[in-house]
Structure formats: structure tokens, C-alpha cells
Amino acid sequence: VRRDAVDADIARWYEVFPRLAERRSQRAGSLSGGEQQMLAIARALMSKPKLLLCDEPSLGLAPLITQELFEVLKKLNADEGLSILLVEQNANLALKVAHRVYLLETGNVVASGTAAEISSDDSIRKAYLGA
């Protein structure tokens, strides 16, 4: 891989995650939890995958950072055609970005469907979405 291609990719992900550009001189270990999550995703995207696996990306993050991160994931899916497999305990947040949902309880699939179907099911809303 040519260095200028790598530099172009880095610049691209700095545009997607401007917080990382602002902190480019910091060591990764000194970044906040949200910034570290953004860095992990940007590093994964450098290899141009067709599928991005995200395990609890909102865990321990401030609400504003979580919102920002999920907006980026949604945009990557819509604009880049990137498939994203998301495991997330914040069901309401996941439903805002998901196309297809598999609801798990103690390791078993208890419901599946489109995000709209899951969101509109009264029994699921009461049991899992706090409605």
C-alpha cells in the first residue's frame, strides 16, 4: 500500500471523526472512552471492510458522544453501503440505526424483524423498550 493512499485514508477518517483530528498528537491511551471507540472504528475502517462488527459501542460513553458515534455508523451504512453488525444493550438507540433486529434474552432470540416491526410491537415495547 502506498503511503499517499494511507495518508488519504487517514485524512478521510479525520473528516468523519473530527475529534480524532483535534487530538492527533495525543497517545491513544490518553483519549477519552468515546474517542478511543472512534479510533478503534477508524482503524478498522482503514482496511476497507465490507462488514463492521461493533460490540456494545455505547458502553461507558457520554450520551452526546454516543449520539455522535451512532450518527456516524448510520451514515457509513447509508452512504458507503457498509454492513454493520451491532450488538447493543441500548435497544432504543439501536433501533434508530438498525434495518434488521434480533432481540436476545439470555442468549436466545426472542423476537426478530425489521426495526419498524420491533418498535411497533406493544409487547416488545413494554418488555424491552421501557414503553
Task: Locate each region found by the language model.
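A short, proline-enriched helix->beta-strand linker immediately N-terminal to the Walker B motif
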Residues: M46-K50
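Conserved ABC ATPase signature
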Residues: R27-L31, E35
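Short, glycine/charged-rich "phosphate-handling" switch motifs in NTP-dependent
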Residues: R100, S112
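Catalytic Walker B motif of ABC-type/P-loop ATPase nucleotide-binding domains
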Residues: L52-E56
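ABC ATPase signature
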Residues: L31, A44-L45
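ABC-type ATPase nucleotide-binding domains, specifically the catalytic core motifs of the NBD
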Residues: V1-A8, V16-A21, G113, A131
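Helical segment within the ABC ATPase nucleotide-binding domain
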Residues: Q67-G81
